[in-house]
């Protein structure tokens, strides 16, 4: 029998609900801080004298840093625990969002956005790992889908805040609001339990370290390259490439949609203005991204993980070119919501299938590498789309994003089916 989000929460224990809320808040506020840059980009470009290529390059730096941060925080989460690593990542991106508002030069802004990216990358794998290890097998897909859906809420909240703040103040104050997520760490520290699976694994590892060296197991001391060896090697490469092409398509498209909608027509945009753009983005998130993220967990429990990936990614590849050709506000609204549904919904599967492929001793670092490593590789997407858009227009550049989603759907066919698998 299918269950909805409310029934899902009723079936969970209080500790499971708190871990879900912590991961969802972290991911929502990650989106909030990350997307503030896109929402004020047109104003930052004007005041700091940035070209589209330079603006895209700053996005590239942030995504590159997120890959580094994902790997770093993955190792950190395996060493000091999921909860503390989650707290550190949230503090990192919150403080640097505030600092971005103090920037007076492009170089200053680049430094702060780079450090913000480190925290942004670390939050995803630590939160996903915490939920995967806390929730039971039969509810795991739906729980992670709920976490992923919070990105859409964060993006919509960022659009709302930017739309309101920019009416009364400049873009710097939009970044200043980005410090607020730091307050969430106070609650996480007191109210969220550590993953019992990680605690048990650490206790086992400590017991092994008390035994003679000849009898000592290798858990906890395995090389990073274990994820490239049998039986994980093929899955690691396939998941890395799926995430790379998917993230290339997503960041290439959604990092440029806000300026694309708000810039005047003569500058290659749609000329909807800041309030029109904010309204379109809120609708896009609440009626496209949010149900897309949320639905994937339920679809994956019916079709399986692999088929669901192929469905969502292939649909995104079809609808992105149609969105790029849209001219009227109504067409932009409807097609934008459809693209957001499929083009972001598949992300709910990345943490899910990765958690089911890898054992506890490798899980956080493997998720950190396959997702945030891919995010680092895809860091060129905003720069490439900005560069192509400067010469040929952003509409034409968006076709590249559709091609990236298609390649991601092909990579999904190489993944193992993990539906119903118990975590090791």
What feature does the model see in each segment?
Residues 1-32:
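Cytosolic juxtamembrane N-terminal segment immediately preceding the first transmembrane helix
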Residues 38, 231-291:
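Extracytoplasmic gate region of multi-pass secondary transporters
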Residues 44-45, 76-77, 161-167, 261-262, ...:
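Interfacial helix-cap and linker-helix signal at transmembrane-aqueous boundaries
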Residues 49, 81, 102-108, 136, ...:
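Helix-breaking motifs and short loop linkers at transmembrane-helix boundaries and internal kinks
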Residues 68-106, 303:
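Conserved MFS/SLC helix-loop-helix module at the cytosolic interface between two early adjacent transmembrane helices
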Residues 112-149:
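Cytoplasmic helix-loop-helix junction between adjacent transmembrane helices
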Residues 147-190:
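Helix-loop-helix hairpin linking two adjacent transmembrane segments in secondary transporters
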Residues 283, 288-291, 298-353:
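C-terminal transmembrane helical hairpin of 12-TM major facilitator-type secondary transporters
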